[in-house]
Amino acid sequence: MADQRDPLEYNWGREHGKRLHVTYDESIAQRPGFSEHTANGIEGAGYDMKERQKRLRSRTAKKTIGILAALLIFLSSTYCFLIYSNIPFIAKWRTIYIETAMGTMTHHWLAEAFIPQNVIDQVMNSRSTIEEEQKGLSSSWSTNTEEAIDYTQAVRPWDQLKSEFTTYYSEIDWDTLKSYLQKHGSSCIDSDGYLYIDEADYGDEDTGIRTTKGDPVCVLDTRNGIVIVTLKGDSYYGKMALVKCASQVSVAASDALGSEGEFIQDIVKSHDAILGINASGFYDPNGTGNGGEAYGMIFSNGKRLRGREGCSMKVISLSKDDRLNVSDKKPSDAREAVQFDPVLILDGDLLISGSSGWGLQPRSVIGQTRDGQMMLTVVDGRQAGYSVGITLGDLSDILYKYGAYQACNLDGGSSSLMYYDGRAITSSSSADSERGRHVPDAWIVSKAGS
């Protein structure tokens, strides 16, 4: 078959930057109307197209450079704005971000990789300032004109307690409890006649019982004189245990203290206790410590146990007459003691506001009301979508709202955990969310009458 291609091939490249190809056959001159001018025009078209492609590539390159330059300027401006802005909202969350990163054992780089050291130092100096200001501060109950209530009467069977319930459990909204009792009847009275309500596991149905402050009550245990309140906020989820009899609260240590810590559940079980939370900090290089070597002194039942000497943190102690004290040195009448800081509430005065250099973290705190109730609180954190953590200022406000007269921070982070009646009722941020980490000791609540 004869070749049907036109002797004049005018092939255009379809891809950007491909050269234009023009093929000229001399036989085309035989066509009617063909002239030298026509041939020159065809050859000129190829030249014009190459120039046009060249100009297009140049304009595209300039446009790309312009976009990249604008993006770089935008990102640089945004970075400077976020790092140095004094707008309250920006400054608050920048501060919390820095404090939170620097408050971890192994994630300082989250701040140091992006933020100038002078900005980090400025933020963290507020923490150092507070620690310096708290030196020399000690609890004093001399201004307390309110007599402690005999909370041993809070531990009675329901038929004996019912008429005086609001005296010993004044934090409970009676109407909401009455509605619960009407709905559930005798099912919430145990075999010995004690009122026992336990919906403390995450995901359990809301009891509908509220405190007088409006928070959900998940546990009401009149056998042991314990109320557990669920704490919920925009960034946090936790539990606060109100223990009626301070005499039931003590410090218990790992059996292998000095060489290895234990899970809180094991410490609680070995002492036949009903509840426990973590207490002392411990030597923890790169987050791999085994909880054996505690920071600061540990006193349990009047006896000094092993612990690092020379610790500058506050001494948190319970006296023989069941008063919680915070001081620089152990009081002579202390029966239980550990060390940590900072002090949150001292003699009824709030000492911490906002993040104050400690950021958003999992927290554990111990406190006591003026009338003698103990407050053991754990707030979960570092778990996106569930609980990020809480600032010390916000936690102080919660304790203050519930009448804390003394309160001090305990070791937090991945060590924070509350164990009650055979299981964890908060979630550790460690690899083992139910058991948490090995710790040197715990604040425990003994079973009533034991």
What is each of the regions a protein language model found here?
Residues 2-450:
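Gly/Ser/Thr/Pro-rich low-complexity, intrinsically disordered segments
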